[in-house]
């Protein structure tokens, strides 16, 4: 049975919250629907035209999102309840419906934001005051499907990873004003995973381009725990793990991590170039087990480093043979499986992460990791809705972790004021935090 992930954001509460931004996104939804419901043939015709720099649409009315009004004021009031270390403050950077993973533009004051729906947002701070001036739909003629993952190549090409397609936009920062944008198909529709393995569950991808020039992509597996018949196939394909490939044509694909349940966040340490990722673990085993994970890939070759799932969670929580996975009772992890760098409290749903390489924050944060905890969805008492900070040792391994920002979860009512998804370092060394529940992006800055 496929179960809803704790990463799922379409709860009844979320739907009511989304009503506030419905008017702002209605035009976007209509434009996307025109492509999606016209069928695959029209969608492919559109991308074929864009690959050849031809006009795919004559509609220049690109949907934008209002940045002021009652919704913005309500969000600002909620931000007054967020607790931060001394000297830090949090402000509203932009209203961005369904905001998920972020990619800060390398050449401009722009931010590209993925969603779990049908839109990628282009966010612009034109006057460099660290507040967005414009939020508009990016490449609306394409008709995206769960374009959650966004990242940059070394030469400034924007990668968008959908549920089962990977696109490369060579000049996203400069051609975003129009509905048609030059595009390269890295992996065409149905080529990232076998179409028969597509699912509504655990389908949000994330990406980074490594120091080796390869595109790294996380691939969640769709079950709470996959059946015995799926284990070997998933490990071979990279479902429930991570793959890497050429970011321009998808060639040279290989599995670099397996034994992963559902990673929805990754980053690369700029110092030693190792790849790190979060992993959300099995539901239904209890409120306080199993722990969430922060992992580090140290042996990417040889068919992929194994991180224990679906046999063991964390350092020693058994899953194979338990009520969650009875048909795996005779299966064991490889002898050399890799333990997590950090165990997080169970079901907090740590998602996006970033290494802090800015210069604004105090020395203790330099080179460390900020991690967004989306918050639990099926725990008896809700947990999460915060930003963690993980410091590193001299050898590059994880040292300590602590809560950096909290208050997105109301401790008295157990309801969410916001649900952090991703963290990114902004131009001035502050950090941005996306929130798909409030439909916003926040900026956390420091002043002694």
Regions found by a protein language model. Name each.
Residues 163-209:
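Asp-box/WD-like beta-propeller blade repeats and closely related beta-sheet repeat scaffolds
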Residues 110-113, 157-160, 214-218, 274-278, ...:
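Conserved beta-propeller blade signature
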Residues 111-131:
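Beta-propeller domains
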Residues 123-130, 169-178, 298-303, 389-396, ...:
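Short loop/turn segments immediately following beta-strands, especially the blade-tip
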Residues 107, 115-116, 163-165, 171, ...:
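Short loop/turn segments immediately following the C-termini of beta-strands
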Residues 45-85, 204, 221-229, 233, ...:
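Beta-propeller domain segments
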Residues 96-109, 141-157, 193-214, 258-273, ...:
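Beta-rich, blade/repeat-based domains predominating
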Residues 424-448:
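Blade-level signature of beta-propeller repeat domains, shared across WD40, Kelch, NHL, RCC1
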């Amino acid at each position: 049975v496929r179960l809803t992930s704790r990463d799922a954001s379409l709860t009844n509460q979320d739907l009511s919250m989304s009503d506030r931004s419905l008017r702002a996104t209605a035009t976007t939804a209509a434009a996307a629907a025109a492509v999606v419901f016209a069928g695959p043939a029209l969608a492919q015709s559109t991308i074929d035209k864009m690959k050849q720099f031809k006009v795919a649409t004559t509609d220049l009315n690109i949907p934008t999102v209002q940045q002021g009004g009652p919704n913005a004021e309500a969000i600002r009031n909620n931000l007054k309840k967020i607790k931060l270390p001394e000297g830090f403050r949090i402000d509203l950077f932009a209203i961005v419906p369904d905001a998920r993973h972020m990619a800060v533009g390398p050449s401009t004051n722009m931010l590209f934001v993925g969603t779990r729906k049908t839109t990628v947002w282009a966010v612009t701070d034109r006057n460099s005051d660290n507040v967005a001036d414009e939020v508009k739909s990016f490449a609306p003629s394409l008709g995206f499907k769960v374009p959650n993952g966004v990242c940059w190549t070394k030469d400034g090409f924007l990668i968008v990873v959908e549920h089962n397609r990977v696109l490369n936009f060579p000049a996203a920062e400069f051609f975003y004003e129009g509905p048609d944008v030059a595009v390269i198909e890295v992996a065409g529709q149905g080529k990232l995973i076998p179409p028969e393995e597509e699912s509504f569950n655990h389908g949000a991808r994330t990406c980074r381009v490594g120091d080796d020039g390869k595109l790294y992509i996380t691939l969640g597996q769709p079950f709470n725990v996959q059946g015995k018949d799926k284990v070997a196939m998933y490990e071979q394909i990279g479902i429930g793990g991570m793959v890497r490939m050429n970011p321009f044509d998808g060639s040279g694909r290989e599995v670099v991590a397996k034994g992963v349940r559902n990673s929805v966040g990754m980053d690369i340490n700029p110092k030693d170039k190792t790849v790190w990722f979060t992993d959300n673990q099995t539901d239904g085993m209890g409120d306080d087990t199993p722990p969430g994970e922060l992992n580090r890939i140290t042996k990417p070759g040889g068919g992929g480093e194994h991180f224990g799932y679906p046999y063991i969670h964390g350092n020693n929580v058994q899953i194979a043979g338990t009520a969650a996975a009875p048909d795996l009772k005779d299966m064991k992890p490889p002898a050399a499986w890799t333990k997590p760098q950090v165990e997080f409290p169970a079901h907090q749903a740590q998602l996006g992460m970033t290494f802090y390489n800015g210069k604004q924050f105090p020395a203790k944060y330099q080179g460390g990791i900020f991690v967004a905890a989306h918050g639990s969805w099926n725990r008896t008492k809700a947990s999460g809705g915060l930003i963690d900070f993980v410091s590193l040792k001299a050898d590059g391994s994880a040292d300590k972790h602590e809560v950096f920002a909290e208050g997105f979860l109301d401790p008295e009512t157990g309801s969410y004021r916001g649900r952090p998804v991703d963290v990114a370092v902004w131009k001035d060394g502050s950090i941005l935090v996306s929130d798909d529940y409030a439909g916003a992006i926040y900026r956390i800055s420091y002043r002694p």
